[in-house]
Amino acid sequence: MTTLLSTIDSPKALRQLNEAKLPQVAQEMRDHIIECVSQSGGHLGASLGVVELTIALHYVFNTPDDRLVWDVGHQSYGHKVLTGRRDQLASIRQRHGLSGFTKRSESPYDPFGTGHSSTSISAAMGMARAAKANGIQRKAVAVIGDGAMGAGMAFEALNHAGHDNHDLDLVVVLNDNEMSISPNVGALSSYLNRMLSGGAYNAFRDGTGKVLKTISRSMWDAAKKAEEHVKGLVMPGTLFEELGFTYFGPINGHDFDALLPTLRNVQKLGGPILLHVITKKGKGFPPAEEHPCTYHGVAPFDKDTGIIQSSSGGTSYTKVFAQELCALAEQNPHIHAITAAMREGTGLNLFEKRFPERFHDVGIAEQHAVTFAAGLATEGILPVVAIYSTFMQRAYDQLIHDVALQDLPVIFALDRAGLVGADGATHAGAYDLSYLRTVPGMTIMAPADENELRHMLHTAVALNKPVALRYPRGTALGLPPEPPHVLEIGRGRTLRKGEHAAILAVGQPVHPALEAAAILEQQGISVSVYDARFVKPLDQRLLQEVAMHGVVLVVEENAVQGGFGSAVLESLSNQGALDRGLKIRCMGIPDRYIPHGTQKELRGEIGLDAVGIATTLKELLG
């Protein structure tokens, strides 16, 4: 049976429909997104929440000539459906399939690549200013969630856009669903909630909303002055208008009768405009509406019942970290935990339940999180900042200037280090070893398995110095638990002794290195395997022992430039080992952006699995 949605291969085709058909398009789009994501997994709730908004934006604005930028991009599945990628949606986040975010190389309707939060207003403002500079008449539209709006970068862009940019054709659509990934926190979220619940405000907006649907451009200036005068009598000036934006809303983001006339009037007006729309995350799929955190990023599920397919059943590294941190916090009342709007993703929801007074969700504000932790540390608190490796990049200056330079005891627990799989290049934890090891005073550890993670967390708590431990996404190895203990700083370990060559690995690749040694053993090649444990400081005695093999392969799951291998080469060079004919190679993430796919697929492609490690070492041996 042919659906209406199947006839739409571009926004131009959408705009040819009578607007009375749009609710049918919305229902069919929801069904299609649910069908595809139930098979592939992906970001379900955010995309379901903006179906009507997505359709309305493409119906009113002349995309791709008008620029449409989706903040983060995980709500863009409907956008992909309308822009020629409908039949590929089932491949989303899979190897050689669609990206889970917007991507410039994927479509001309994706003018800006996204993945990290709160970049859309800055990017759209740049596009709007460039259009003016080039003499082009077009709108730049940024769609940003209320969670992302709480980040510093978004406020920086609002501040700039509203200042002396009255001719700027910029529209910011605030998609207010009271969620980022976890429920929103902070004063902005509270402000929006108060504004929505205010009786006088809503009575006023109900009246002005009716006028807005019919107002002409010629009446606008007078109406604006009148609105400001009357509004001042019934409510304080809104935050956004004080920043220099013309504010409209809030309107129902699921109601075409509200969306279309409002967007048409917004399209006619100049200057920076903020349109506030109210949506429900997971709209149209009851399990996602009732459990928005669970269905934010979801594994394949039964589309009829909503039951999510179970994973392998093992314990994740994230959960191992969270459970051990809770155990340590039972003994140490000075331990506090900090997250930047990722309490479930980092496992700190477990900590929050047990120690709510020592748990801090700062919102999407990584820079603030790090300096907030530094302030806590000055007063005898031991803060643990649990953060994805890719988001640690956003607070590098704070890590150096506010933590390391002052030698403050802050623990950075870097989750999703290395290859992350389906989220792709924007979320790869590929750089932390490279940028952290340059910082004086930092101790850096990378566990090979869950027992090592427990040991290293105990070591970090005991150290009383700036320290980072990085661990991968996914299920731990399922090893029998060992009693956790404090490790000697800067000491690695010997896992296997051989005669012909040595593999020196750190972090996740340690166990694949052991498997590679077993493969080579079957071919008559005897290989030693070492676990460095510490990237900084390095175990100099261990390096001397490794170099004595004459043939060395260094393996890490980090960018090969500037990472662990580079540190080993620098140290061996200083020891003079490279002057004595040592054959050494470094394996890691190559100097390119690794696309999305499963971790197993990606490790196989770049040679960071057991077979790839064995093959590389055999080639090195000649």
From Swiss-Prot:
Any GO CC annotation of this UniProt entry: cytosol
Pfam families for this protein: DXP_synthase_N, Transket_pyr, Transketolase_C
SMART domains: Transket_pyr (SM00861)
EC number(s) given by UniProt: 2.2.1.7
Binding site for thiamine diphosphate: H74, G115, H116, S117, G147, A148, N177, F285, E366
Keyword terms of this UniProt record: Isoprene biosynthesis, Magnesium, Metal-binding, Thiamine biosynthesis, Thiamine pyrophosphate, Transferase
Cofactor detail note: Binds 1 Mg(2+) ion per subunit.
A GO term, aspect molecular function: thiamine pyrophosphate binding
Cofactor dependence: Mg(2+); thiamine diphosphate
InterPro entries xrefs: Dxylulose-5-P_synthase (IPR005477), THDP-binding (IPR029061), Transketo_C/PFOR_II (IPR009014), Transketolase-like_Pyr-bd (IPR005475), Transketolase_BS (IPR020826), Transketolase_C (IPR033248), Transketolase_CS (IPR049557)
Main enzyme class: transferase
GO biological process: 1-deoxy-D-xylulose 5-phosphate biosynthetic process; isopentenyl diphosphate biosynthetic process, methylerythritol 4-phosphate pathway; terpenoid biosynthetic process; thiamine biosynthetic process
Pathway(s) per entry: Metabolic intermediate biosynthesis; 1-deoxy-D-xylulose 5-phosphate biosynthesis; 1-deoxy-D-xylulose 5-phosphate from D-glyceraldehyde 3-phosphate and pyruvate: step 1/1
Catalyzed reaction equations: D-glyceraldehyde 3-phosphate + pyruvate + H(+) = 1-deoxy-D-xylulose 5-phosphate + CO2
CDD domains according to UniProt: TPP_DXS, TPP_PYR_DXS_TK_like
Gene3D superfamilies in UniProt: 3.40.50.920, 3.40.50.970
PANTHER family: 1-D-DEOXYXYLULOSE 5-PHOSPHATE SYNTHASE-RELATED, 1-DEOXY-D-XYLULOSE-5-PHOSPHATE SYNTHASE, CHLOROPLASTIC
Subunit description: Homodimer.
Recorded family membership: Belongs to the transketolase family. DXPS subfamily.
Role, per record: Catalyzes the acyloin condensation reaction between C atoms 2 and 3 of pyruvate and glyceraldehyde 3-phosphate to yield 1-deoxy-D-xylulose-5-phosphate (DXP).
Protein name per Swiss-Prot or TrEMBL: 1-deoxy-D-xylulose-5-phosphate synthase
Native source species: Magnetococcus marinus (strain ATCC BAA-1437 / JCM 17883 / MC-1)
Gene expressing this chain: dxs
